Amino acid sequence: MSGGLKEQITGKVEKTKGQVKEGIGEVTEDRELKNEGKWEKTKGTIKEKVGKVKQKISDGLDNKE
């Protein structure tokens, strides 16, 4: 598995965990948990996008060889 794909998957998992935490924080009115979920969701989104860029770069380099 390429680094880019692995990072995309890790990002999606982290983003999903963040969404769940944010939702639970919303329902339970736990601001700290809600904010923690938002932060995890943001980190996951960034990881996912970085993984996509890495994958495109890797694919581009593979095509040149």
Swiss-Prot record:
Q: Name one Pfam family in it.
A: CsbD
**SUPFAM superfamilies named in the record:** Hypothetical protein YjbJ
Give residue spans, biased composition: Basic and acidic residues.
12-28
Segments of this protein annotated with the region Disordered: 1-28
Matches recorded under Gene3D superfamilies: YjbJ
Lineage, top-rank taxon, reads: Bacteria
- PANTHER family linked to this entry: UPF0337 PROTEIN YJBJ (PTHR34977:SF1)
Q: Which family does it belong to?
A: Belongs to the UPF0337 (CsbD) family.
Please state what the protein is called.
Answer: UPF0337 protein BCE_1081
Q: What is the lineage of its organism?
A: Bacteria, Bacillati, Bacillota, Bacilli, Bacillales
